[in-house]
Amino acid sequence: MAQVSGMSDVPDMGRRQFMNLLTFGTITGTALGALYPVVKYFIPPASGGTGGGAVAKDALGNDIKVSEYLAKHLPGDRSLAQGIKGDPTYVIVTEDHQIANYGLNAVCTHLGCVVPWNVSENKFICPCHGSQYDSTGKVVRGPAPLSLALVKATVTEDDKLVFTPWTEIDFRTGKEPWWT
């Protein structure tokens, strides 16, 4: 091929090569875009921060204000609130009319039914298969294999109830928590 003076020796990109690069770039971009959420799913979130805490909410979705809650509930009362991950969680009023430092996840450890508090028998009784738990959520009759999960209940400075994951030893069994 003859060279014209003043022209550099840079080869032209042919039409076919350009279309191949364009197609490859489009397919690669689409594949990476589709794989991003899959990869993100398998990478655990960074630890630290609030530890997955949630402000307790009442049946209407309003934040629970402890002073208002205690005005409406008697000592020994156990009532449901929305807790961590939206799970139904029992708020417990102690005998000295304070919020207990723990709450109970109301999901039965047998098949996942919500376990109601039975005031007359002073225990939780699962309506699905009859599992029973004492007032602290410890299993006393199966078929449930484990006690109800605990959450830490804390009252904030602005009078709200916050649930955070329970990471200490389970005071009912003296063992590491099974739910962590």
From Swiss-Prot:
Q: How is the cofactor bound?
A: Binds 1 [2Fe-2S] cluster per subunit.
Q: Name one Pfam family in it.
A: Rieske
Q: List required co-factors.
A: [2Fe-2S] cluster
Its record classes its membrane topology as: Single-pass membrane protein
Q: Identify the stretch annotated as signal peptide in this record.
A: none
- The reply on keyword Glycoprotein is no
Q: Which GO terms describe its biological process?
A: photosynthesis
Output the InterPro entries linked to this UniProt entry.
Cyt_b6_f_Rieske, Rieske_2Fe-2S, Rieske_2Fe-2S_sf, Rieske_Fe-S_prot, Rieske_Fe-S_prot_C
SUPFAM superfamilies the record matches: ISP domain
Q: Where in the cell is it found?
A: Cellular thylakoid membrane
Among the GO molecular function terms of this UniProt record, one is: metal ion binding
Residue stretches making up the Rieske domain: 66-162
On the tree of life, the source organism's domain of life is: Bacteria
Q: Which residues bind [2Fe-2S] cluster?
A: C108, H110, C126, H129
| Enzymatic class | translocase
Reactions it catalyzes: 2 oxidized [plastocyanin] + a plastoquinol + 2 H(+)(in) = 2 reduced [plastocyanin] + a plastoquinone + 4 H(+)(out)
Disulfide linkages recorded for this protein, renumbered to the chain, are: C113-C128
State a GO cellular component annotated for this protein.
Answer: plasma membrane-derived thylakoid membrane
Keyword list (alphabetical) reads: 2Fe-2S, Disulfide bond, Electron transport, Iron, Iron-sulfur, Membrane, Metal-binding, Thylakoid, Translocase, Transmembrane, Transmembrane helix, Transport
Query: What does the record give as the function of this protein?
Result: Component of the cytochrome b6-f complex, which mediates electron transfer between photosystem II (PSII) and photosystem I (PSI), cyclic electron flow around PSI, and state transitions.
- Quaternary structure annotation from Swiss-Prot or TrEMBL: The 4 large subunits of the cytochrome b6-f complex are cytochrome b6, subunit IV (17 kDa polypeptide, PetD), cytochrome f and the Rieske protein, while the 4 small subunits are PetG, PetL, PetM and PetN. The complex functions as a dimer.
Q: What else is known?
A: The Rieske iron-sulfur protein is a high potential 2Fe-2S protein.
Q: Supply the HAMAP family for this chain.
A: Cytb6_f_Rieske
Family named by the database record: Belongs to the Rieske iron-sulfur protein family.
The protein in question is named Cytochrome b6-f complex iron-sulfur subunit
Q: Which organism is it from?
A: Thermosynechococcus vestitus (strain NIES-2133 / IAM M-273 / BP-1)
Query: What is this protein's gene name?
Result: petC
